[in-house]
């Protein structure tokens, strides 16, 4: 929804909350006043706001009370030279821009932790040259869109982690080690070559390859999301009295993280499902609806 004033931002939050919306995502071109009004309106209802930001820096958003930032430092405008207030300078943050001032990056991570802003990593979108698992479920035209617009020449899952991706994992690890609430997400779907579910495995692999212990990567992928949603007492870990969906894996991903893909059975609400049959049922259809 396009917003033009702080009043319209607050009104939009109230309208969609009345329809049952439980959280909100701000996008690139909101002003600080508009974002602040949306956050205040959401918080009055006990709801949260996340954001893929640009016109507003991460530090500014933290001051406004945002609950989460999407894509970590990937979309941050804090490192853009001559950034103008309330204007998006365009383009993602480059590897060189992030590397130019390590002290500034570290201080920003500290600030996000201090302000209790969660940090959602979406690493798989930067790893489609090495890893694009699950694209066989795409409709042919959607798959062609991705393969024709692949950001980098296709490589192998065994290829070294690209330097830009390694840098982003490093920021996620630093945030996690500082006590920040790191969340795991995937972005984008469709022509971006990132397939939900499959890409969650890629996220876990990226974290482990970038220095996380396997247990830390799993925590970021499960319990931390539940904690952010305020549901950690019910979901997020396997414990007596909690609700838990489970997977049976033919391997040991704590030894070889790539074994996380070897899923034999998925248990959802106590019922076991064959993942191969589920995938075959949607093969060639994803993206049609």
Question: Model regions: which residues?
Answer:
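Glycine-enriched alpha-helix->loop->beta-strand junction motifs that scaffold or abut catalytic
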Residues: 44-46, 64-70, 115-116, 179
